Amino acid sequence: MSDARTIHLDQPSRSRIVPTSWILGLLTGSLLIVIAMMGWADLGMDFLKASNAKYLLALMLLAAIRYILRYQSSGWQRVARDFCEYVGLFLFISLLGATATYPAAAATSGFADAALARIDAMLGFDWVRWYMLVVDNPWLQIAGSLAYANIYMSPVLLLGGLALSGERARAQLFLVSFWLAALITMLLFLAMPAVGPLAYVWQGPIPYMPTSALYQAELLPLLRDNMLGAVDLGALQGLVCAPSFHTAAAVIYIAMAWQCRYLRWPLLVINGAMLLSTPVEGTHYLVDMIGGAMVGLFALCTAGAIQYSLPKIRASRQWRETRIWQNLTSSSSAAVPPAVQSRDG
């Protein structure tokens, strides 16, 4: 591994690193908004409950390691510092995004399943046939459930690789893209709540209950009627049908891993399997996945555009500060009268 990748010597990449204070400010603002949403929806959270406290303790541990190693700039200490920072931020974004869907669900009304199923029919996608393929092959049920759970395996591998190579700018690009995809997904969810094809399309007894089960159909009415009461971080369920966040995440994972030859093909296989499992395990329409892919691409492009504009923003800011300083110094010089030499001197 070259020194340019191990140590932050690439000046263009360094100039695209987002100040940590900006990211913390962004996440703090997001947290305050979610807290306000929870209050509006009459939802609480008991942090003394073990299922909630374990995530809080994990975040505190990662933050503590990051703080202790804050001055390390080489060796395994730097890798550990960066990895803890990246994983901590990813965990915070994931928990915050999933939690936000609960008060967001309380603000929804109606269901978009009829329109989504109609679009699937126009696309020629038969969800029931796809589901029956899994029902008739038990090994697909096991493989599908494992593949669907890989939404949390890919980022650990990806962020670990970026921490090892010292590519801080790319790690931040991934995190900002993931945050932006979560935000867009939640906003679209407000306009397109749905219970999913298992609840809407399937008729009769359910021969195989996938990972996402019937949570949308069960939880959305409770949240709309303010009957849930509290959110449990240890029992968070996917409430968003359209667009598919698993698909958005897979697009981001694959795109970010494509530049790393050690992770490119493993993550392509892992996320390809996750995408194949999404219609059944996530109870998604095909149009959900198309929408999710578009969300992932848009988030990547937007975050990339912001990051690539940072050098220009910094240069413009530096130019303005220089001009202000020059004006101040020139003004102060003009205000001081020139020294008059004494005749005796």
Where are these regions (language model features)?
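Interfacial segments of alpha-helical transmembrane regions
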Residues: R81-F90, V156-P193, P197-P207
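Interfacial helix-loop-helix junctions of multi-pass membrane proteins
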Residues: G196-A199, C241, G272-A299
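Membrane-interface loop-to-helix entry segments
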Residues: L140-S154, Q237-W258, L286, I290
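Short, Lys/Arg-rich, polar N-terminal cytosolic tail immediately upstream
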Residues: M1-I17
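Aromatic-anchored segments of alpha-helical transmembrane domains
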Residues: S30-M38, S94, A182-F189, G272-V280
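N-terminal transmembrane-helix/juxtamembrane module of multi-pass inner/ER membrane proteins
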Residues: R14-A58, A80, C84-P155, S331
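Membrane-interfacial alpha-helical segments at the cytosolic side of multi-pass membrane proteins
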Residues: L157-L164, T247-R264, M294-A305
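Membrane-interfacial catalytic/cofactor-binding modules of polytopic membrane enzymes
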Residues: L187, A191-Q259
